[in-house]
Amino acid sequence: MLSSALKSIVVSAKKIPPHLEIKKITLIDNGNNKKELLSIIENYSAFSLNIQYYSAGENLGYGQAHNIAIYRSDAVYHLIVNPDVIISPESLWTGINYLENNNEVVAVSPSAVDGKNNIHYLAKSYPSLLVLLVRALNLKKIEKNILKKIEKYELREVVHNKKIVEVQIISGCFMLCKTKALHKVGGFDSRYFLYFEDFSLSIELHKIGKIMYLPDMKIIHFGGNSSRKGMKHICMFVASMIKFFNRYGWKIF
């Protein structure tokens, strides 16, 4: 999957003007995958991309691992992206061009589908406890009864209208940001090991600028859905959710 993700970056990078070309790609090893990752990097040695490998030494968690790259970045723009994301050819330039021409915007989020072409709703409104638990626990019977709340949370109307709009929260699977803004807010909050670190970062970024949903910036995301990953992930989800609500305010319904 990582090799395919890198290939999509290589293709998309070709659409970017030379003065804004990608300075480097940083691969953070949050496990013990050095041999595999270095082999993948070697496969891309023929391309004019500076791909750097960093070992976290241990599993630091999603946000802390990304902070390694964020703190080292001296580029104008910084893309936070998962290894299970395929970027469409025009997407990087679509996002960078928008950031270039809108000084008040600090981050942009794409439209997304999964591997089966189902829509993924990456931009969201402020969550409620009810909606989060129903989705995390995959409670289908209850989900039908609160569908309007879920649609509002997932900004489904916004996505289906295919218009550029300002949003409050975006997914950490793909966040194209101004690096200065990331440095100003301190990157991801280290108190979140997994889940809600992107919600927290979004809110902090939104305090200093606008976050925009760009329907013409497109990706395929093959991950997501904590309910399918077992009880351990559900427990981590709930623990991070409590931290998030304690800091930013509880919304029950």
Specify the residue positions occupied by each region the protein language model found:
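Short, well-formed alpha-helical segments that are part of the catalytic scaffolds
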Residues: 1-17
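A conserved acidic beta->alpha catalytic loop
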Residues: 8, 26-38
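Glycine-rich, basic loop-to-helix element that forms the pyrophosphate-binding segment
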Residues: 55-73
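Short aromatic/hydrophobic "clamp" motif used to bind/position activated sugar donors
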Residues: 78
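Conserved donor NDP-sugar-binding/catalytic core segment of glycosyltransferases
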Residues: 86-122
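Short, flexible, basic/aromatic active-site loop/helix in glycosyltransferases
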Residues: 127-167
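A short, conserved alpha-helix in the catalytic core of glycosyltransferases
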Residues: 159-162, 166-187, 191-218
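Active-site-adjacent helix/loop segment of glycosyltransferases
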Residues: 199-203, 207-253
